[in-house]
C-alpha cells in the first residue's frame, strides 16, 4: 500500500460522469500474409493463458487515499476481445472507440482496460488501450507500449503491456530508507529553485505583459464554442499524415516542425470555426504540454505548459506561423534559464489559477486557454506484435468542462498520427477538422511552391 501522489489525487478528483480522466491509444496492426485464420484467436488465447504476472501500477487499485495491490486481480475484467460487424470499416472502428472512450473506468478495479478488435478491413486488427491519467501521462504511455512490442518481426510470445516491468514497478519496491532520502532531496531542490522562480516572474512575466505583443498569459483566451461545458458523449477522429510534408515546410520557411504543426492546427481551427460562424475576433490560445523528463522513466507526470498564441485572427498563413513561432520561442527561452524543478514551480505559480478553475468546476467568462494541442514523440522504427506489423497508432486524450476539444499527435516511422477527441454535443461535425488539416498543409505547400517559382524566375 502506498499513498496517492498529489498529482494522482488531482486527476482522480477531476473525474465525474461527464468528465472521464483516462487517456487511450488506438493501435492498428497488419496481420501477416502467411498467418493462419486463427491468428487473432491464438494471440488472445496466448494472453489469457500467459503466466506473466501484472506489475505495478497495473495490479494497483484505489483504497481510499492509497494505491493497494489487487489481490483478486481478474484479467477478464480488463482484457476483452470483440469483432466489428462486416465490412469493418474505419468509420465503424472510430465509432466504437468513441463509445468506449466515453465510459468511466471501474474504481473497484485497477484503472485500465485493453480491447482486441478484429474484423477490420484490409486484413487488420486493432488494440485499444485505456488507462487513467492518475497512472500514466502521454509520454510514459507511449514508452510503455513501445516496450511491450518488438522491433523483430520474428519474435513471438511477447509479454502483454501490463506485465512489462518498468522503472516505476521497481521503484515501488524500493526500501523505505531510499524513498525518504529521495523525499528530502526533493524538498531541498524545491527550496533551491524558489529564488530563480521569483526572479523569472519579476523579470520576464510581469515585463512581458502589456509590452510583448506575442506574450500570452492565463485567462486571455477569447470566448469560443470550444469552451463549453461537456457531456459524457465523445467523438474520436484520427488520421495519418506524411511527416516529410511537415519537414519540407519547416525547412523551406526556416522554422521548427512543431511550429508548422501548430500553424497547421491554427489554420484548421480557423476554417472550422468560420464554417460555424464562430471565429473569435481575438486569437485562440493553445496550451501546449512540454515534457521536461531528464531520464528514461516510463511513468509519472513530468510536464510543463506553454501557452501559444495561435494567431487565428490573421488570414495570412505566414503571419500566423510567425506569430506562433515568436510566441513559443518566448516560452522556450524562459525555460532554458531554469532547471526542471524551477520550471515546475514556475508553472505552478503562473498556471495555478487555471488549475484551480478546472478543479472547482467554475466557468469564468475567460478561460486560461481554448484547447490543448499535444505532440508526443513516438517510435521511429517499425514495431511488431507476434509478427503483426504496427501500421498506425492514434492517441485519444481528455476533454474537460470549458475545454471541449483536444488535439493530440504522435510520430511513428515517417508519419504524424493525429487523434482528435471532443464532446460530441458541443462540437458538431468535429471530424471535418481532419479535412481542414489537410487543406492547411496544402496551403503551405502552395505558398512554398510560389516562392520557389519566383526564385526560379529571377
From Swiss-Prot:
It catalyses: a long chain fatty alcohol + a fatty acyl-CoA = a wax ester + CoA; an acyl-CoA + a 1,2-diacyl-sn-glycerol = a triacyl-sn-glycerol + CoA. GO terms for molecular function: diacylglycerol O-acyltransferase activity; long-chain-alcohol O-fatty-acyltransferase activity. The keyword 4Fe-4S does not apply. The active site is at residue 133. It is an enzyme of class 2 (transferase). GO terms for biological process: biological process involved in interaction with host; glycerol metabolic process; response to hypoxia; response to nitric oxide; triglyceride biosynthetic process. InterPro entries: Acyl_transf_WS/DGAT, O-acyltransferase_WSD1-like, O-acyltransferase_WSD1_C, O-acyltransferase_WSD1_N. Its EC number is 2.3.1.20, 2.3.1.75. Disruption phenotype: Cells lacking this gene do not make wax ester and only trace amounts of triacylglycerol. Keywords: Acyltransferase, Glycerol metabolism, Lipid biosynthesis, Lipid metabolism, Transferase. GO terms for cellular component: plasma membrane. Pathway: Glycerolipid metabolism; triacylglycerol biosynthesis. Coiled coil: none annotated. Bifunctional wax ester synthase/diacylglycerol acyltransferase (WS and DGAT). Catalyzes the terminal and only committed step in triacylglycerol synthesis by using diacylglycerol and fatty acyl CoA as substrates. Required for storage lipid synthesis. WS uses C(12)-CoA to C(18)-CoA substrates whereas DGAT prefers C(20)-CoA. Upon expression in E.coli and Pseudomonas citronellolis (DSM 50332) both WS and DGAT activities increase. Belongs to the long-chain O-acyltransferase family. This is O-acyltransferase WSD. It comes from Acinetobacter baylyi (strain ATCC 33305 / BD413 / ADP1).
